[in-house]
Every structure is written in C-alpha cells, then in structure tokens.
Amino acid sequence: MRCDVRALALAARGLIELMIVIPMVAGCSNAGSNKSVGTISSTPGNTEGHHGPMFPRCGGISDQTMSQLTKVTGLTNTARNSVGCQWLAGGGIVGPHFSFSWYRGSPIGRERKTEELSRASVDDININGHSGFIAVGNEPSLGDSLCEVGIQFQDDFIEWSVSFSQKPFPSPCGIAKELTRQSIANSK
C-alpha cells in the first residue's frame, strides 16, 4: 500500500510538470500563426543619442577641493571610475557623503521624478546656461542637510549629491551648485 501512495504522488508530480512545460514549449513555436517572422538586421541603426560634453574623472574635482568646500576633514574618495566618484568621511558609510555621477544616454526626467517622490522640494535650476533640477532633502534634527543638482547636456546629465549627517555644516545646495559650476567648467 505504501508503494502505491508513493507511485501515485510521483505520477501526480510528473503530470503537473508536464502541464507547466507543454504550454511553455508550445509558446516557442509559431506553428499555426499567421504572423510572419521578421528578420534581425545586422546593420546598425541610427540608435546613437546626442551626447553632451566629456567630463573628467570625478567631474574634475580634487579631493582637496572637496575638503575645502564641505569643511569635512578626513574625506576619502572610496569610489572612483569614469562615470562617478564618492567621498566619505574616513571612508566609512556613517557620516557625510558626497558624490558625482555622469549618466550617458540616460534621461534626466526619470531621475527628477525619483527626486520628486523622495525629497522635500525639487525646483528648476540653470547653471552656466545649462538647465536641470535642484532637490533638497531634510531631516527633523538637521534641517536641509541634503542637496542634489542634476544638469542636462543633450541626452546625458551629471548629478552632484551633497549630504551632511551632523551640525554644523555649510549650505549643501551652495556646495552642490559650486561643484556643478566647476564640473561644467572642467568639461570638454
């Protein structure tokens, strides 16, 4: 009797697996379909965007400039590559953080929408003739402690993020705007 129950369970399991697999395999077939199957072109289409200027590593901002503007000692550049940099106090994740990001072929509107959903305010801004947004984040104990500036360059944009974790601190938006100005001046 025990073998019969086990055999029945295995048969049921096999039937269930077949019920799942058969529709999946059938979905891969175009049998009975009146739709023609298109070919994939091997020639590249005109999918390249219109890129803005080139930005040097870290937006052209040195570690010394970051320390001077933020008034934070012991800043360490913990992430540095061709599209962004991040500075942390003492290299740790607890404390103030500052970052530069360069988004090639990415819509600034999506980033702005994210900011609108998560920040206290988001406004239009123009820096050196380039438009974008400025987003302010605040915390009850700190006030306005975070500022992000995103500036569009055709199909690209850059973003500076400045965030403090304890008082006193200089104006996050003053710093973010100055870093953005300097990065624009450093672009080619």
UniProtKB/Swiss-Prot annotation:
Q: Name one GO cellular component term.
A: plasma membrane
Keyword field contains Secreted: no
InterPro entries named among the record's database cross-references: DUF3558 (IPR024520)
Membrane topology summary: Lipid-anchor
Q: Where is the lipid attached (S-diacylglycerol cysteine)?
A: 28
| Matching Pfam families | DUF3558
Q: Does the keyword Cell membrane apply?
A: yes
- Where does this chain mainly localize? membrane
User: Which residue numbers carry lipidation of type N-palmitoyl cysteine?
Assistant: 28
UniProt KW keywords:
Cell membrane, Lipoprotein, Membrane, Palmitate, Signal
The subcellular localization recorded is: Cell membrane
Q: Which domain of life is it from?
A: Bacteria
Annotated signal sequence range:
1-27
Which PROSITE patterns has this protein been placed in? PROKAR_LIPOPROTEIN
What is the protein name given in its UniProt record? Putative lipoprotein LprB
Q: Which organism is it from?
A: Mycobacterium leprae (strain TN)
Q: What is this protein's gene name?
A: lprB
